Amino acid sequence: MADQQLPAEQVDGIRDSYAFDEPAIDLGVLDNGGEPVTDARIRIPLRMVARHGLIAGATGTGKTVTLQLLAESLSSAGVPVLAADIEGDLSGIALPGVPGDRLAARTAANGQAWEPRANPVEFFALGGRGSGIPLRATVSS
């Protein structure tokens, strides 16, 4: 199924569905049977981001990378982001990424310009444990 090509009219429909004339964050491009369609950008309008969303998948399917991309994109658009990062997976957005051959090949194939950059980050620590600005949380009924 992954290597089957979508008919041209479906590709056109997807391209048109994600073409917004308003501020949006760019998630990537359409993968049509293993081939990136660089002019079919997958985007979410900023006004839609305040709604509920779900990122689900098996281990290794890109959930954390998707969250990083969303947080970085929102931050770049001037939208403050609060992310509860229990595992510490998102803390890397505080530093510029390290370019590599695989990343360069992927972004070039997707028609994306990639530059390493750091994002503004403040770290908080629940209950004063760990590094970061201590926060206290009280749960009551």
Language-model regions: role of each:
Residues 1-58, 65-77, 81-82, 87-109, ...:
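Basic- and hydrophobic-enriched, low-structure N-terminal and domain-boundary segments
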